[in-house]
Structures are given as structure tokens and as C-alpha cells.
């Protein structure tokens, strides 16, 4: 079909409401597909990749940080870029949630990425898809698998602070708590939990999140008994009592900047950095996760295959599609005059059909 934007906009404004409602319903049923931007913004992945490559020169942590942003976005109302929104008078930002405050990072990189994409393809690529592509590219650039992610998401109109506080897994979670957290967002396979936890194969963590493990586990005055004793002494040297709680420690002591399967080798040796990681192998409830840890430790390709599958499943958690939500021009704020702007998006969407 071919319409001029002005004629279609006039038609949508003047036609009886039922016709526009039917149009809206049909567009809202759109499905995610890796080819979504093949015609409208074919270079989006290259733009994202180039932005990350430039940032890695000065910030080797950024790839892991972007992957974490995507994870924390998808666990709160689906992958809708709600984590990128700043505070407004209408809602509190998810950046202030317990799992994000003083730890979520990489927002300026996403800003630069979005500006570059907007310059090449105005009003086309959502922030939700941008963050999804950025997570995939970050993994690949760090030595992990390469795959084409399903696309076509749109951006939320608000943030969800309370939901972020309720949904984001904590570093002190037990295995049953982790399973509940994943199950609550539709990730009910043990392989989802174990494979996605492998995102901790690169990146860093702050001392504040492991102090109890090192010195006062479960208020016993003793360290976590599942910690390898040699590794315990190493961590205590990096995170001493009364030390800097913001000091950084590598998640993976073997290959801290490479996306590989060494995270699982560490778990087998009781060298998981945070409690929720080691729970996958050392919990009394780990009968279903231990075989997966061993399988991934034995085969990088087995881990990569499971990780890609789990990432696609996570990326498909209740996405906004079609005419739901909007395509933000600035990932930090909802578009002003959003009703008129979103109507223009509908016109553009129909005109491309």
C-alpha cells in the first residue's frame, strides 16, 4: 500500500473511530523479527558496534555494563527501555532501584549511540531495540557468540521503580529466590537461569555486594562456607574491613574481560564472586543446575548456544510492538507532544506496508 503522510493522517483523524481502532489493533500484533530494520535502517548494528568499539578504548568495562543494562531492562515490564528514563514529576526512574543505584552504568554511551542512529535513521529505531542490539554486540566484541537478535520493540511511556525493586535479582539471593525471580518474568527453564548468569563471565562488581560473604555470612560472624579458602583470602585482600566499598573486583578471576565459559569453571572450584552465582553449584537445591554448570564448563559452544537461546527468550518478555508505546527521540525522556508524534509514526508504519 502507498499513502502520503498527509492524506493518511487526515484519514485517521477524520474516519470513524472504529476504523482507526481496527487499524491500531492490526498494527499492535506485529511480531519481532531480525529483519525489522533491514530496509528502514540497515546500518543500525554497525553504528551500535562502532560506538561500543570507540568506548572500549577508554572503558574496558562498558561491554559488560551494557549487557547488564539490557538484563535489568527486560526484567522490569519487559524489554521496553524503561531503565533508560530519567526522573520526571510523573514517575521515579528505575535507575534509583536497589539493583541499579550506584551500579547501573553506560547511559551516556547509549545516548551517543542513539544520537548517531537518529542522524542516520530519524524516528526509526527504538531505544529498546537499540539496547538489545548493544547487548548482543557487547557480547560478540568480548569474544562471545554472534547472532541476529529479533527486533521490532517499542519504548515504554514511563518507568517502574517499584517493579524494579520487586523483580531484579539480588546478589545475596538463594537458588530458590533466583528461580522465583526468573519464573516471575516467564523464564522458567533452569537453562535460562544458568545460561544468563553466565553474563558474569566478564565485568566487575563492587566490594559492598560481597562484604557479608567475606566476613559475616548470614550474621554468623564467619565467611560463606561455600567460598574456596584461597579465593576468600584473595577477596579479603581486595575488600578489607573498613575499606572502600566501591572498590571493584573482577567477576571472573581467570579471563575478566573475555566472554567465555570460565565463569562456570570458577563455580566448580567454589570461586563464584557473589552468593547468587555460587548458589548455582553449591546450593542444596542445585540438582537441576549443577549438571548445566558442568556442561557449560566443559564446552564453550554448549554455553554459547544456551546463552543465545536464553537471551532471545529474555528479549521476548512482553515486548511493546506495532503502535504500542513509542519510538523515543531521546532515550532519557518520553517524547513531548507524544500523541501527535505517535500518530505520525502510525502513518509512517502504514505507508511502509
Swiss-Prot record:
GO CC list: extracellular region; vacuole
Residues reported to bind heme b: 200
Binding site for Ca(2+) 2: 201, 252, 255, 260
Pfam families: peroxidase
GO biological process, one term: response to oxidative stress
Subunit-level organization: Monomer.
Functional description taken from the UniProt entry: Removal of H(2)O(2), oxidation of toxic reductants, biosynthesis and degradation of lignin, suberization, auxin catabolism, response to environmental stresses such as wounding, pathogen attack and oxidative stress. These functions might be dependent on each isozyme/isoform in each plant tissue.
Annotated protein name in UniProt: Peroxidase C1A
Organism from which the protein derives: Armoracia rusticana (Horseradish)
Protein's gene: PRXC1A
